[in-house]
Amino acid sequence: MIQPQTLLNVADNSGARKLMCIRIIGASNYRYAHIGDVIVAVIKEAVPNMPLERSEVIRAVIVRTCKELKRDNGMIIRYDDNAAVVIDQEGNPKGTRVFGSIARELRQLNFTKIVSLAPEVL
């Protein structure tokens, strides 16, 4: 579960390393974000000489959470970290690579470009 002030790792090569969630996109009363939700975040740590810089406000989609994700078939998926992929206004990733595994639920939420870049889909 991701809420405002949560720190996340970045799972792509866009230039950001750490993000802090500041808002969850959707209904005004959303308290937590889960896998596949879009958030507004601020970059807390970035790689030098890259397009994205520190203290820049961006959009990102959650691809991994420490909180368990229960599927309809009874399978439970849990990751070791909270991670997100930086996206633009149209929902396309800003980076050209995605690191680590991502959940299959992103394909159902029309993030097919992110799914195609991922090395492993669980």
From Swiss-Prot:
One of its GO terms (molecular function) is large ribosomal subunit rRNA binding. Signal peptide: none annotated. Keywords: Chloroplast, Plastid, Ribonucleoprotein, Ribosomal protein, RNA-binding, rRNA-binding. InterPro entries: Ribosomal_uL14, Ribosomal_uL14_bac-type, Ribosomal_uL14_CS, Ribosomal_uL14_sf. Binds to 23S rRNA. Belongs to the universal ribosomal protein uL14 family. This is Large ribosomal subunit protein uL14c. It comes from Nymphaea alba.
